[in-house]
Regions:
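A shared catalytic/ligand-binding motif for oxyanion handling
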Residues: 1-232
Length: 232
């Protein structure tokens, strides 16, 4: 089963829609998790129909401040037996019945980007961990690094936020599944001495999923952070 996790940074422009459409044709994902869509429910519903998804849950963007920010969506094909459990502006949690006797859990997670609010991401992740015990893969963008070697650039990364992230992953028994492809998944687009690039961690899984997700493959691309993975 192929799945796609993409921080699209607004789906309102045709370039982003074209990239997503091309990925659909190339990778044929059964599940898609989108972050920072900056779209409302009706706009994502149209996209869902255009891409021939039958199921979907949309968390609309926030327009309370006069612009658009945030917005999540999880879309899935008709043969995927997916059941939404909970959702918020920072997550969509679901159970998939691939095998009725052995369901597994997938969570699309989008961490708070603001440094002053990142502790809320870890409170949410701990809460999700406490809700149930089963094979679990958590995809998305945590907006944090695990170590300083996941960043290159002139601005040094503070240690304490990375430690807080490592601590919450340990508490939730979530392990980084690694990747194939380029090491860095984001850059600030600035020239020369101001250039910064980072590897924002991809999917993680619980210990219970170590055998269930054996053979999972990852491709991480630098262009508009996206992660494509296959559950074998």
């Amino acid at each position: 089963m192929n799945a796609l996790s993409w921080n699209c940074r607004r789906l309102g422009n045709q370039r982003a829609v074209n990239v997503l459409s091309n990925l659909m044709g190339e990778k044929k994902p059964k599940i898609v998790f989108l972050m920072e869509t900056k779209q409302m429910v009706d706009e994502i519903r149209k996209l869902k129909e255009d891409l021939h998804f039958t199921g979907g849950l949309v968390v609309p963007c926030d327009r309370s401040w006069g612009g658009r920010r945030g917005g999540l969506a999880m879309l899935w094909k008709d043969k995927v037996d997916l059941h939404i459990q909970t959702y918020s502006p920072h997550h969509i949690d679901a159970i998939i019945q691939t095998n009725p006797r052995n369901p597994w859990r997938i969570t699309g997670f989008y961490g708070y980007p603001e440094e002053s609010h990142k502790h809320k991401s870890w409170i949410l992740l701990r809460h999700l961990h406490s809700r149930m015990s089963m094979s679990w893969v958590c995809i998305g963008d945590y907006n944090e690094l695990l170590s300083s070697d996941e960043k290159q650039g002139r601005i040094e990364k503070a240690f304490s936020p990375m430690l807080a992230f490592r601590n919450v992953l340990a508490h939730c028994e979530l392990a980084d599944l690694g990747f194939q492809g380029g090491k860095f998944t984001w850059n600030n687009g600035k020239p020369s001495m101001d250039f910064v690039q980072e590897r924002l961690i991809g999917p993680v899984q619980t210990k219970l999923g170590e055998t269930y997700f054996r053979g999972v493959k990852f491709v991480i691309s630098l262009l508009l952070t996206r992660t494509i993975f296959q559950l074998c």
